């Protein structure tokens, strides 16, 4: 029975991907299967509902309480142990739910407010330094940065991803810079206390990491930290050998100096 229901949902989903209008009258079935007692059926329904939400979030808005409730149950380890991966509860279901919530909470204070508590719980539980736990934290930060913002939640996110930035693992470091970039898009202030950890990434031998760091520092800069950041960029410029990277860095230093110069003398010295 369970396998039949799961395969039926997956088949409908495949038809939807090829010809959405053919199964538009059956969208209610995906919603119905979201409440199935078997997690594998529910998970299959989530995949379909994710695609529907990406296409048009509005019809799925009233499912926010259901998605939040399912995520809460997963985080609280209420799904069977067979769904654990490296002792993390149903990580792929968590990530799918986070992607759905990111769509539904965008520019919607009411929907987002319902999500804040469970997202905070996901951050706390996912921050266990395992690879899959890090993936969940990364996705959770992207979700928190996509929905109507909560200052408390975003501060929590910035604190968690600063550990990524300080990691010796370059993949994790890059993910941390990317996640911090999402937060900075909302308000650069959330990343200010972590700016020195970001600056340290400028000395990394990985070129893509250095480029990502320069981009983030550029967007983090304000009148109260322009001197520190531009000074570090100048140090980087002196040692850089890549022509294009030197050119890009020089351009950005000029833009920041023009925009935030604390004094005429500083501007002249910098330029």
Task: Identify the meaning behind each predicted range.
Residues 1-271:
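Extended alpha-solenoid helical-repeat scaffolds
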